[in-house]
Each structure stands twice: as structure tokens, then as C-alpha cells.
Amino acid sequence: MDVPSSWDALRKQARKIEAQLDEQMHSYRRLVSTKALSKSDGNESDLEAGIDLLLRQLQQVNAQMQAWVSSGGSEMVSHTLTRHQEILQDLTQEFYRHRSSLRAKQEHASLLEDFREFDRTRLDLEDGYGSEQALIKEHMGINRNTAQMDGVISQAQATLGTLVFQRSTFGGINSKLSNVASRLPTVNTILAAIKRKKSMDTIILSLVAAVCTFLIFIYWITK
């Protein structure tokens, strides 16, 4: 920035910077008032840097005006300097106030975003835990079904073994029955012969008894 050589040039320079500051402060006020709760971006940073630069330039011009007044300026010049100094002070205070408000909003937004991120992480962990629990339950269900299937297979194998044993037992019985059946004709023949022999013995005994009785009767009559 060129250094003005006269009071009028300093005043013009001060008013020019003040006008630029008014314009940028208007934009900054609107930004702060309408800024949604979000983290910092490049818009306010660029605007703040421009305002801060203009404030430093206005401060330098005021310092030059102060040096001019100190070198023997009139009371009117001193009053003009005071007015420019008040404008600089008001703009500086307003800028710092709005910037503090914006920083508070940004910090609040950052905290909210951190909490949201924490909630998302927690939900992701809970979802992961829920999925893990579901897999564990599914695995346990498969194990239970496998155990039940093993039990059914064991029972089936035991039943099959019993049936095989019974089949072999019945096979032995059938074999014995077949043996007996094959020998029955011989047994029947023997039994029939025994019965016939008993019948003959009975007949003979009966005849002997009858003869003896007849002889005794004859003997008794002739006596």
C-alpha cells in the first residue's frame, strides 16, 4: 500500500478501506447469521482473511493520520482522526464478536458430528455383534440338528442290528423246524409201530385173561 503524502490522501485512503470493510462485514454478518451448524469450510476462512487484512491496513492509515496530527494538525483534523479511530475500533470489535460466534457454532457442529460418528460406530458395532450372535445361534442350531440326526442314525443302526439278530434267530428256528419236519415221518412210523405193539399186547393179554377165566370157570363147575 502506497503511503499518502497529505492529510486528504490519508482520509481518502481511510474511507476507501472503511467502505471495503463495510461491504465485507455485511457479507460476514450474513454468513454468520445464516450459517448452518457445520464444520469450517473455505468460505468464511477467505472472508475472515480479507477482513483481517483490511483492518490492518486501516490501522496503518490511522497510525499515519495520528502522526500527521501529532506534527501540528488542527482541532478539526484531530476530531476527524478520532472518528476514524472509533470506526476502526467498532469494526474490529464487531468482527471479533461475529468470529467468536461463528467459532462457537463450528465447535458445536463439530461436537454434534463427533456424537453422530460415535452413534454410527456404536450402531455398526451393535449390528456386527447382532450378526455375530445370529451366526452363533445358527451354528448352535446346526449343531443341535446334527446331534439329533446322529441320535436318529444311532437308533436306526440299533434297530437294524436287532432286526438282523431276530432274523438270524428266526432262521435258526426255521432250520430246526425244517429238521424236525423232515424227521417226522420216521417218528410217526415208530410211534405207530409202538401203538400197534401195545394194541397186540392188549389183545393177547385180554385173550390170556379170558382163557384163564374160562378155565377157572370150567374147573369150578367140574369140582
UniProtKB/Swiss-Prot annotation:
InterPro entries: Golgi_SNAP_su1 (IPR023601). It is a single-pass type IV membrane protein. Residues 1-201 are cytoplasmic. GO terms for cellular component: cis-Golgi network; Golgi apparatus; Golgi membrane. Residues 223 are vesicular. Its main location: Golgi. Residues 8-67 form a coiled coil. The chain crosses the membrane at residues 202-222. It is found in: Golgi apparatus membrane. It holds the Pfam family V-SNARE_C. Involved in transport from the ER to the Golgi apparatus as well as in intra-Golgi transport. It belongs to a super-family of proteins called t-SNAREs or soluble NSF (N-ethylmaleimide-sensitive factor) attachment protein receptor. Component of several multiprotein Golgi SNARE complexes. This is Golgi SNAP receptor complex member 1-1. It comes from Arabidopsis thaliana (Mouse-ear cress). The lineage of its organism: Eukaryota, Viridiplantae, Streptophyta, Embryophyta, Tracheophyta. The gene is GOS11.
